[in-house]
From Swiss-Prot:
GO biological process: mitochondrial protein processing; signal peptide processing
Disulfide bonds: none
Species name: Schizosaccharomyces pombe (strain 972 / ATCC 24843)
Location of the protein in the cell: Membrane
Top-rank taxon, per record: Eukaryota
Major site of localization recorded for this protein: membrane
InterPro entries in the record: Peptidase_S54_rhomboid_dom, Rhomboid-like_sf, Rhomboid_protease_S54
Family to which this protein belongs: To yeast YGR101w.
Topology term for the membrane: Multi-pass membrane protein
Record GO cellular component, one term: membrane
Protein name: Uncharacterized protein C13E7.11
GO MF, one annotated term: serine-type endopeptidase activity
Pfam families for the chain: Rhomboid
Transmembrane annotation, as ranges: 32-52, 74-94, 109-129, 133-153, 157-177, 188-208, 214-234, 247-267
């Protein structure tokens, strides 16, 4: 999750050109209260898990459709490639000319503004990348970790987990911004990094012996848990040192979203996964048919 220039904010005031100001305080417009994005995140996250739970129950209790055919399910590879395709598609849309109607639309819905929060942008921004390198790094990491977690969770649960991790990481980013900077305008955020941290954290829980290679040290395998802790320690340092360290200020990385995603992924893997599976267990055979369909003899 990276910070982005707040071009969309200036458009709210009818600006025709873009001028960068590192800190601006808006006095006449009230920022979006935090209870709105929090309520949105809880509501949408709950709805996605409820829908996934319903679909998984239906698949387990009724493995065949009413016509006798198995209920189709997309393969894990197809699901992962579909999500990557959405990210690539949004990246292609960003190639539109600056200040065009399409670019303005993306600035409004594909970038999460920390002050004037557009609720759909809390989800869409996680599929949005402006930089080719940002997209490449995130999608390589996503393709490396996601297939294993899709196989563990199943397609429906993974989609609910992925959307919820996006929302949780963005809420963490918003909370940090309001607590740290108040109503000061900072660059908006976009990118899938927060959700990828959640997937990596879940992978480290289910596959603790798995090893990864860091791009700068490709020939040195590192336990995934150690690598994840190292990255989260770096994010914690960046969170604390922003404003004091020139490097932390220069990177414009949304460290709070990374930490929020990692924490959500680990907590869900430890507690949420087992709870979800208990709720989708198939019903006993004796209860799978309505009472009036059973044969009764006297």
């Amino acid at each position: 999750m990276n910070r982005l220039n707040f071009q969309s904010l200036l458009w709210k005031f009818g600006q025709k050109r873009f001028y960068y100001r590192p800190w601006i305080r808006i006095e006449n417009i009230k920022p979006t209260p935090l209870w709105k994005p929090i309520t949105f995140a809880v509501g949408v996250g709950s709805a996605t898990f409820y829908t996934a739970n319903y679909l998984d129950k239906r698949r387990k209790n009724y493995p065949k459709s009413s016509y006798g055919f198995p209920i189709p399910q997309t393969s894990s590879r197809s699901l992962v490639l579909s999500i990557i395709g959405i990210n690539v598609g949004v990246f292609a849309l960003w190639r539109a000319p600056r200040f065009s109607h399409l670019n303005r639309f993306l600035q409004k819905y594909a970038v999460m503004n920390p002050i004037f929060i557009n609720m759909p942008s809390m989800i869409v921004s996680a599929f949005s990348h402006q930089s080719g390198w940002h997209l490449l790094f995130n999608m390589v990491a996503f393709y490396s970790f996601a297939p294993a977690i899709v196989d563990v969770f199943g397609n429906n649960q993974f989609v609910a987990f992925y959307i919820s991790s996006i929302l949780f990481s963005n809420v963490a980013s918003l909370l940090h911004h309001r607590l740290r900077f108040g109503t000061k305008v900072t660059p908006g955020s976009l990118g899938a990094s927060g959700a990828i941290y959640a997937i990596a954290a879940a992978t480290s829980y289910f596959f603790p012996n798995a090893s990864v290679s860091i791009i700068f040290l490709p020939f040195i395998p590192i336990k995934i848990g150690v690598a994840l802790l190292g990255l989260m320690a770096f994010d914690a340092w960046g969170l604390i040192s922003r404003g004091f360290s020139s490097f932390a200020n220069f990177t414009l990385i949304d460290h709070a979203a990374h930490l929020g995603g990692g924490i959500f992924g680990w907590l869900y893997a430890k507690y949420g996964y087992s709870t979800y599976n208990r709720s989708t267990r198939p019903r006993p055979p004796s209860l799978s048919k309505p009472f009036f369909s059973r044969s009764v003899s006297f």
